[in-house]
Every structure is written in structure tokens, then in C-alpha cells.
């Protein structure tokens, strides 16, 4: 039968092993989130540029505004 000190050491080693596995898992999650955030930033920049183009394209001079055909 292991002594109290040996039992504590085994318990600590077991906890350390679980913590190391958890740190590795969390690191993987963070890396995946970083990739997702980078992809979303690119998409937002693209959408912002497209929106800007639409806004600039829809702003014209009042002379360009023609009355609807039913007038």
C-alpha cells in the first residue's frame, strides 16, 4: 500500500497530466478562433468596401435624377 506521500505525489502527477491536456485543448481552440477572426475581418473589410462602392454609386447630382415615367 502506498504511503500518504506517494498517494499525494500520484494525485499531483495525475492532476498535472489533466491540466497539460486541458492547456493543449484550449490552445487548439484559441488557434481555431484566431483563424476564424482573421477570416471574418477579411469578410468585413470586403463588405465595407462593397457598401462604400454602392453608397458612392447611388449618390449622383440632382440633374441626374429624372422623374419617374408616370409623370
From Swiss-Prot:
Quote the protein name from its UniProt record: Protein SlyX homolog
Q: Which Pfam families match?
A: SlyX (PF04102)
The protein's matches in PANTHER family, at most eight in alphabetical order, are given as:
PROTEIN SLYX (PTHR36508:SF1)
Name the species this protein comes from.
Answer: Rhodospirillum rubrum (strain ATCC 11170 / ATH 1.1.1 / DSM 467 / LMG 4362 / NCIMB 8255 / S1)
Family (UniProt): Belongs to the SlyX family.
Extract the HAMAP family matched here: SlyX (MF_00715)
Checking InterPro entries in the record gives:
SlyX
Amino acid at each position: 500500500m502506498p504511503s500518504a506521500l506517494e498517494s499525494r505525489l500520484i494525485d499531483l502527477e495525475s492532476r498535472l497530466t489533466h491540466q497539460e491536456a486541458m492547456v493543449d485543448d484550449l490552445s487548439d481552440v484559441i488557434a481555431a478562433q484566431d483563424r476564424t477572426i482573421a477570416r471574418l475581418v477579411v469578410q468585413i473589410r470586403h463588405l465595407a468596401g462593397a457598401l462604400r462602392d454602392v453608397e458612392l454609386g447611388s449618390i449622383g447630382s440632382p440633374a441626374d435624377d429624372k422623374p419617374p415615367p408616370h409623370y
